[in-house]
């Protein structure tokens, strides 16, 4: 890649994004449901491990179609990560850390952060968006774009 990894990530974090999530849409701020209690439930074991495996399924299958260029906690970057290492890094990042995955030669980005119950996909092409939607659905997850409505 012509520019460095961190610069590419920084630019992509400003791009339109979609959420890969266990929920089918954004929960409104004024929802009468128990989003935070449910989110905490999914952050506990064994639910968290199951959720991590669903996300790993998406990334590993995506790696069959596209190169993944991965950085963990802002450290070194790896192209063609071993599937077991990618699983380990993602699981660790979702517990306590941060993972950045560049896709399509740095045109798109997936991030995972500790304490989150979702992945975030930035700047996908229409083809990548459709592929990730299919992979997420197959893994029992949803792909949605956040609302610009301030009530959400």
Q: What are these language model-derived features?
A:
Residues 1-118, 123-152:
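Structured alpha/beta or helical-core interaction and ligand-binding surfaces enriched in interleaved
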């Amino acid at each position: 890649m012509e520019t460095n990894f961190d610069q590419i990530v920084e630019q992509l974090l400003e791009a339109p994004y979609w959420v890969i999530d266990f929920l089918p849409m954004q929960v409104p701020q004024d929802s009468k449901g128990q989003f935070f209690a449910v989110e905490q439930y999914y952050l506990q074991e064994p639910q968290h491990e199951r959720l991590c495996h669903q996300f790993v399924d998406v990334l590993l299958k995506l790696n069959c179609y596209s190169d993944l260029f991965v950085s963990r906690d802002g450290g070194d970057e790896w192209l063609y990560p071993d599937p077991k290492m990618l699983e380990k890094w993602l699981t660790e990042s979702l517990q306590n850390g941060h993972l950045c995955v560049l896709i399509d030669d740095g045109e798109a980005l997936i991030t995972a952060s500790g304490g989150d119950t979702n992945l975030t996909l930035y700047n996908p092409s229409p083809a990548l968006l459709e592929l990730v939607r299919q992979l997420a659905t197959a893994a029992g997850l949803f792909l949605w774009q956040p609302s610009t409505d301030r009530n959400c």
